[in-house]
Regions:
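Flexible, acidic/Gly-rich N-terminal and inter-domain linker regions that tether
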Residues: 1-64
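Conserved, mostly hydrophobic/aromatic
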Residues: 11, 37, 67, 110, ...
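Short Fe-S-cluster ligation motifs
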Residues: 91-112
Length: 253
């Protein structure tokens, strides 16, 4: 552990094996890692902590995908679960955004299932509706899966499609749909979902058009520490090129 921490202090880029070594830390070793991490955090952003007042708007729970871990969608593997399928109207979505802004929210997050009837223009329409209803609010919306599906259904490339979303009022992308960026694990967890490369391509395109995004990582299911290391490395490598990721969010399974 100390050898790896020395490499961190020397500003060396950690290898997959070195990251796995850090994940093996126990007891006092964890404290040592935390101290180094805290110092790096201080050097990067200081001690000021900020937050946003956010409202999540999940516009549909209908989804054609078959992710084995999902506790939300009502699709092919969950037809008798989780209540009644729903799809909010554009007016419903706009009203929720307007209400959020009036209550002091600074951000809305837009996510939902991959509805079989959506075309790519649906996400453009949702963005327009939210921006019109809540002009000052930050619109944080649409997973890489939604973006990829929307572009595909319109026959557009990602840069063109994301540019249209930005023009409609989109401010940034969430990192969800990443789950764990290790395709061996994804083949078990979410076999019909986008691949690691497709997730990265979507976020690279978002950064290219000037949209920031974040990285999420779902952990605690069937993956292992090497999967975590792979996830960190591929997102670290993209960040080195684009600088477009604004935060990392760990999501316990």
């Amino acid at each position: 552990i100390q050898r790896v921490l020395d490499a961190v202090a020397a500003e060396e880029q950690l290898t997959e094996d070195e990251i796995v070594t850090l994940f093996s830390a126990r007891g006092p070793e964890v404290n040592a890692i935390a101290e180094v991490a805290d110092q790096l955090r201080f050097e990067a952003v200081g001690d000021t902590v900020t937050w946003v007042h956010n409202r999540n708007i999940n516009y549909t729970n209908v989804c054609t995908f078959k992710c084995r871990f999902c506790g939300f969608s009502k699709g092919p593997m969950s037809l008798n679960l989780r209540g009644t399928p729903y799809l909010l109207t554009l007016d419903d979505i706009a009203e929720r955004a307007r209400e959020a802004e009036e209550l002091g929210a600074t951000e809305v997050t837009l996510q939902g299932g991959i509805h079989p009837d959506f075309d790519g223009d649906y996400y453009i329409d949702v963005t327009h509706a939210v921006r019109s209803a809540a002009p000052s609010i930050h619109v944080h919306g649409f997973t890489a899966l939604e973006i990829t599906e929307g572009a595909k259904r319109l026959g557009e490339d990602l840069v063109t499609y994301l540019g249209r979303l930005k023009e409609a009022g989109l401010s940034s992308l969430p990192g969800t749909a990443a789950e764990i960026l290790d395709d061996t694990i994804r083949a078990e967890l979410c076999p019909d979902k986008i691949t690691t490369a497709e997730w990265l391509d979507c976020h690279a395109a978002a950064h290219e058009v000037g949209l920031g995004s974040n990285v999420t990582m779902m952990f605690g299911s069937i993956e292992h520490p090497r999967s975590w290391a792979k996830h960190f490395i591929v997102t670290r490598d993209l960040q080195a090129v684009t600088g477009g990721f604004t935060e990392f969010v760990g999501l316990p399974f």
